[in-house]
Amino acid sequence: MSSYLDRIGAGFIISNPEALDFDFVPNEIVGREAVQSELANKFASIDRHESSCRAIITGPVGSGKTVLAKTFCRDLQRHLANKREIMIAHVNCRNASTSTRVVQRILHEIDPGHPDRGLSMGELLLSLRKLTRKNSSHLIVVLDEVDHMLRKSGDDLLYQLLRIDEDQQGKGTLSLILITSIIVFLIINVF
């Protein structure tokens, strides 16, 4: 028959095929130490309970922005394991391009049983406030490809997320990482 099919089941050509998966996160990123240090500097105060941090990661498609954010968040959770519980909500805004869908995905990340339907944006944000305050943990929201959401829904959600602790006397419950391949300042009105 066909000899080229003899390779099927004969063994792997690639020793670690998981490394080619879309969601694969390596143990370490090689050659990106300066960028990792810069991101760590932006989050230097996150070990204090009253602190929230913000960062924008930009770069061309395929430059490693998403894997940088994922490794940073994973490493930060490990680093602060005995000091502060860190929860991560990573939302791809290309797949969830409206503000409502983004907040639903954030809520589902921190509470898988949260209802997906029947709540207004105000009710969703109230649920997010309650969930972040109920736990003594800190939530890092990563909005990947945020420019898609900004074009479709505007910047109101960013404003709401940045102001989520406004009545908490400085208690930081939410930090924000925005990832984009374009300069977001051209899209958002105020940041």
Which positions does each model-derived feature cover?
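Mid-core helix/loop region of P-loop NTP-binding domains shared across ATPases and GTPases
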Residues: M1-N16, D21, H49-S52, A69, ...
